[in-house]
Each structure stands twice: as C-alpha cells, then as structure tokens.
Design a protein with these regions (language model features):
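Extracellular zinc-dependent metalloprotease catalytic-domain scaffold
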Residues: 1-182
C-alpha cells in the first residue's frame, strides 16, 4: 500500500494509548513518496505524519539490517508474511508513535514468535519544544534491539530476571551504537 503499513512494521500514532492504530496512517503520494513538513523548532503535534514516517523507516531499516546478519524468519523475526521460510508470521512490529501512555521513555514488548511485538515511543516534555523519540534513531534501534534479544533468548519469555534484563539493555545499546555508526 501507500501508507506506513508493511510486512515488517505497522507504524502509526497511538495518542489515546489504547494500543489501536490511530487512523488514517500517513499517506504517500501516488509515487510512494512520503514527504512531510518537519521543523525541530516545532512541537511534535505539528509534525505527526513526519514522525510516523520516520518511525516506519527506522523499523524497516533495522529489520533489513538485522535480516542480513541472521535475524531471519526461522530465527523469529518480525514479519506478517514469512514467505514459507520458517518461523511464525503475523507478527510485524506495531510501532506506536507519540504513544499517550507515557512520557520520557520508550519500550518494546516481545511475545513469542507469531505474536505481535509492540514498540511504544513517547514524547519527552520539558524542553522547548518537547521532543519526539520516534525521530531519534538511537532510541528506535535500541528498542528494536529488545525485540531481537527477547526473541533469541528464551523465545520471547527468556529475559525477565534482573541480570538478564540488564544484559538486554547493554545489547540494545550496542545495536544502536554499532549499527548507527557505520
């Protein structure tokens, strides 16, 4: 389609924090060009389509990069259609931009393969203007990193103790620092 919904990610707003995509999603031009106004001097409410589009891009970029490194269908990656290559489908990342359920944070909930992973990206108030975590590649890749490590260790349920959760934070920081510094 011509919206921020694809095989790897469903990127959308979730302003009311109900975990249901706020629609309509950003729409591209007939040539699938998603070109929206953005100014870092403006409040996040003024560039929502740009924010969701960037979140869609980052999620697809990290999906493809990690796929090339072995996080494929049979390893439990996040895809709606696995094209007969193993693993369970119907689990594209649900990427909630400007999620209304929190502030000053982001998170990634990772159930087992075949169930939807959920990335929640929040607004960081207090500055002038407020900041949108969907536009920060380090945060998006870090959160996606939780999805990767949670799927690879214990099939979505293996990183729950304090020590393993601490390791998960370190791995996610490593993904962001190493992949975005290339």
């Amino acid at each position: 389609g011509n919206e921020t919904l694809g095989n790897n990610v469903d990127a959308h707003l979730d302003l009311n924090a109900d975990n249901i995509a706020d629609t309509p999603r950003p729409q591209g031009s007939p040539g699938r060009v998603f070109d929206f106004t953005f100014s870092s001097a403006s409040e996040p409410t003024t560039y929502r389509d740009a924010s969701v589009t960037q979140l869609f891009y980052y999620n697809n970029w990290i999906h493809d990069r990690m796929y090339s490194l072995g996080f494929t269908e049979s390893a439990g990656n996040f895809q709606t259609n696995n094209f007969g290559r193993g693993g369970n489908g119907n689990d594209a990342v649900q990427a909630d931009g400007q999620d209304g359920s929190g502030t000053n944070n982001a998170n990634f909930s990772t159930p087992s393969d075949g169930s939807l992973g959920r990335m929640q990206m929040y607004i960081w108030p207090g500055g002038t203007p407020d900041r949108d975590s969907s536009l920060d590649g380090d945060i998006v890749v870090h959160e996606y990193g939780h999805g990767i490590s949670n799927r690879l260790v214990g099939g979505g349920v293996g990183i729950s103790a304090w020590q393993s959760r601490g390791m998960g934070e370190g791995w996610s920081d490593f993904y962001a620092m190493s992949l975005l510094s290339e």
